[in-house]
Amino acid sequence: MSPKTPASKGRTRGRNAGRGVGSASHSASGGRSTAQQHRQWLGLVDTEGPFLSVPVLTDLYPQGIPGMSRERREVLRAAKPALDRAWDTWDADRDSEATLTSYRHARDAWVDTVLTEVLGWDGLWTTAQDRPVLAETYRAASDGIQAVTVTPTGALMRGEEVGALVLVTDPADSLREVGQDGWATSPIDRVAAMLRAPGSTCSIGVVTDGRWWAMVSAPREGSAASGVVDCQTWVEEPATREAFCELLSVRRLVGGTAAHRLPRLFEDSVLAAEEVTE
């Protein structure tokens, strides 16, 4: 089930494919400090740029990342096998349009389940098809006469507030791979470009091909950062699953106070790193 080439470069470990959804038990963390727990799951994320820092995470989650509810784990357990089968079929015959079409159907169902039922975006998840203004506002394009244009698949929205953009892509070995459509950028780069569109009011994005999931931070001022996780490792590494789902929950994107939302966590992480450097 492993792809033919590594998913991404750098720090990612635990890439062996899993086939279900494990429990939310944190018994393995016994005897370790909260900072060590955060450091461990961060070490399993393929990060690039100024990603979330251990001090900031420890301050917000002094007891560690909260576990996922049993109901949400059951939703994942029921939905994941269909995605696994579709990926395997596509991976065995990558040049077939039929297998790609079949994979897209399975991917879309899986992504919808993760966003609405696992992350809890139900009622707030809005597609660009339903809200054309998303495509108009967050459009990004390459330079040149024959420009390649990309728009978000949808977004988490509360009223007119955009909490996170979402881009769903075709299957690939890595979300950091440069596209083959004439624009020499990766899906992650394209999300960053959309987040920095002239009319953007959002700095957080999510990009996925179904298997790989990336969290992207791209403030208008400052460096972009991203972290990629493999949903196949959500079995043997539930801590990364729970951290990913908690950080992309409604309360971290459009709920609570701004000081406890994901954009501020990225901002504070940059400041913390600068203080250490000084």
Predicted regions span which residues?
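Short, basic/polar, glycine-containing "phosphate-handling" surface segments that engage DNA
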Residues: 1-101, 159-278
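Acidic-basic catalytic patches of nuclease active cores, encompassing PD-(D/E)XK
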Residues: 97-134
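Generic alpha-helix structural propensity
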Residues: 105-110, 149, 185-189
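Generic ordered-secondary-structure signal
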Residues: 110, 120, 155-156, 171, ...
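Active-site metal-binding core of divalent-cation-utilizing nuclease and nuclease-like domains
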Residues: 119, 123-160
